[in-house]
Amino acid sequence: MNMKILVLVAVLCLVVSTHAERHSKTDMEDSPMIQERKCLPPGKPCYGATQKIPCCGVCSHNNCT
């Protein structure tokens, strides 16, 4: 009886860990922290803090530097 319970617990642990690993890989692909950060290269026009994509450097005189 005890052996059946141990086998059942082991199988459940294996199923749960496989399921969690599969979902963690999906989360990594969708995570914005993992994705490459986009920024404007030097010479591109910029508009300060209100623009959606920031400069890679600094916005000076409406141009990224």
UniProtKB/Swiss-Prot annotation:
<protein>
    <recommendedName>
        <fullName>Hainantoxin-X</fullName>
    </recommendedName>
</protein>
<keyword id="KW-0872">Ion channel impairing toxin</keyword>
<comment type="function">
    <text>Reversibly blocks N-type calcium channels (Cav2.2/CACNA1B) in rat dorsal root ganglion cells. Elicits no toxic symptoms in either vertebrates or invertebrates during a period of 48 hours post-injection, when it was assayed in vivo by direct injection into mice and cockroaches.</text>
</comment>
<feature type="disulfide bond">
    <location>
        <begin position="46"/>
        <end position="59"/>
    </location>
</feature>
<feature type="disulfide bond">
    <location>
        <begin position="55"/>
        <end position="64"/>
    </location>
</feature>
<dbReference type="GO" id="GO:0005246">
    <property type="term" value="F:calcium channel regulator activity"/>
</dbReference>
<feature type="disulfide bond">
    <location>
        <begin position="39"/>
        <end position="56"/>
    </location>
</feature>
<keyword id="KW-0960">Knottin</keyword>
<keyword id="KW-0528">Neurotoxin</keyword>
<feature type="propeptide">
    <location>
        <begin position="21"/>
        <end position="37"/>
    </location>
</feature>
<dbReference type="GO" id="GO:0005576">
    <property type="term" value="C:extracellular region"/>
</dbReference>
<feature type="signal peptide">
    <location>
        <begin position="1"/>
        <end position="20"/>
    </location>
</feature>
<keyword id="KW-0964">Secreted</keyword>
<keyword id="KW-1218">Voltage-gated calcium channel impairing toxin</keyword>
<keyword id="KW-0108">Calcium channel impairing toxin</keyword>
<keyword id="KW-0732">Signal</keyword>
<comment type="similarity">
    <text>Belongs to the neurotoxin 36 family. 02 subfamily.</text>
</comment>
<dbReference type="GO" id="GO:0090729">
    <property type="term" value="F:toxin activity"/>
</dbReference>
<keyword id="KW-0800">Toxin</keyword>
<keyword id="KW-1015">Disulfide bond</keyword>
